[in-house]
Amino acid sequence: MSRRRAVFFDRDGTLIEETHYCADPARVKIFPGVSAALRRLHDAGFLVFVITNQSGIGQGLMTEAQYRAVEAEVQRQAGEGLIDGVYFCADAPEEASARRKPQPGMVLEAAVEHGIDLEGSFFVGDKAADVECGRRAGTRTILVRTGYGVSEECPADFIAADAAAAVDWLLRNDS
């Protein structure tokens, strides 16, 4: 079986507006252009995954059921079938965790489960931890200037205005 390529996205602040421990599906607001960008990735043969830290669960600020309801709304707004998988880490920031970004555990898990070529893949996020996660996993990285990315500085392969612009760039520069 040939290895597949993927684009890994952070969720909060990258695909949807940052709302600080979103536990209510009514607060989910996907950024403009995200659904069309995800469709373009699928049309180009990429798998699409969401890689998200959800420490609000580990800190008792939301339940896993609330998280799953929010995630279902994200999937609905993004477009059914456009996100191939979601990996989340509920560990609190102070916990030692191989899965919590910037550690690459969730990306590596997805790569094994889906036969992904990480060198031919990308990680898109709004925080230095997202970029570092992608770098540690062996992907190319894109920092977006939405969410926390407005003020983040880190050595990403590219800096884009938003997720849609990131997809434009990666499709133009994919080799």
Report the location of each language-model feature.
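Short glycine-rich anion-binding loops that position phosphate/pyrophosphate groups of nucleotides
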Residues: 14, 55, 128
